[in-house]
Structure formats: C-alpha cells, structure tokens
Regions:
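C-terminal helix-rich "cap/oligomerization" subdomain common to oxidoreductases
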Residues: 102-142
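Solvent-exposed, non-membrane alpha-helical residues enriched in polar/charged side chains
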Residues: 31, 100-101
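A short glycine-threonine-serine/GTX helix/turn-capping micro-motif
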Residues: 14-20, 83-87, 109
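Rossmann-like dinucleotide-binding domain that binds NAD(P)(H)
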Residues: 5-70, 113-120
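Short, histidine-centered active-site or binding-site loop motifs used for metal coordination
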Residues: 8-10, 77-79, 103
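C-terminal substrate-binding/catalytic lobe of Rossmann-fold NAD(P)-dependent oxidoreductases
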Residues: 47-99
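A general structural signal for well-ordered alpha-helical segments in protein cores
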Residues: 26-27, 93-97, 122
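Rossmann-like NAD(P)H-binding beta-loop-alpha module
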Residues: 1-3
Length: 142
C-alpha cells in the first residue's frame, strides 16, 4: 500500500462537539487499519468539509470528513486499487458488548493508551484545521 483514503462524517462546527463527535470512529478506523503511529496531520476546510492527510512514516492517508450517506475506503497499491464500503451498521452493538464485558470483568475493554489514542489524533486534527498548518500528533501512550 502506497497511499489510502476514506470518507466519514464529521463537522468542524458540529453542535455536538465538532470533529470529536464522529471523529473518534475515524481515528479508530485509521489505527485499526494502519496502526497507531500517526506522525502528523494537515487539514483544509472548504465549504464546511474537512479534508485531512494523516502522515505515517511510509504512508499518507487522506480522510474526507463530509456529511454523506455512504462511507468508503480505498487502498492504492503500485499495481492496483482496492475500494471497499465501510459498514457501520453493527458499531453500536459491538461497542455496547465491549462495555458490558468491561463492567462484568471489571477491566477496561482496551489498554488506556488505545482508548486515549483517538483523542490525541483528533486534538492534532482540530489544531491543523484551525491553524491551516501541519500539526504533530502526540506519541502513543504505552
């Protein structure tokens, strides 16, 4: 994979907390698919949509945050491109199951660093969108 892109909902000026409302899902998609080691992010805001490029050591991932009804991801390779729909129909059921498991076992569903990582990523994204400059993402917690 030499590059990737995806779209997902997100509004910088959402009354529900801005990009943090849906952005956590996007950050989890990024860290699940490409790993937690995002170095930095650049963002552009046009007509209310945020387009961000998340920089890894050997990969750039473009995310279009826009209020659309379908979500897709694309992986770009040297010889082919793979495009796939992102199905979020079971996301709340999966999250609730992890929550219940955590309550029953009295253990967090993920290590604290994993739970905090989307917040670190979104903090940098909001900074980049507001300043128009590249923002560095805090290193993952161990």
């Amino acid at each position: 994979v030499i590059s990737a892109g995806l779209n997902f909902p997100g509004e910088l000026d959402s009354p529900y907390g801005g990009l943090y409302f849906y952005g956590g899902h996007t950050a989890e998609i990024l860290t699940t698919a490409f790993g937690p080691d995002i170095i930095s992010v650049k963002a552009d805001v046009t007509a209310g949509n945020v387009i961000a490029v998340f920089k890894y050591a050997s990969l750039g991932v473009c995310v279009n945050f826009a209020e659309v009804s379908e979500f897709h991801a694309a992986l770009y390779g040297a010889k082919e491109v793979a495009v796939h729909s992102i199905d979020i129909s079971t996301i709340y059921r999966q999250g609730f199951a992890k929550f219940v498991q955590g309550v029953l076992t009295r253990t967090p569903p993920e290590p604290y660093g994993t739970l905090l990582r989307p917040v670190q990523i979104l903090n940098a994204l909001v900074e980049a969108a507001q300043t128009g400059r590249e923002a560095f993402v805090a290193p993952p917690l161990e």
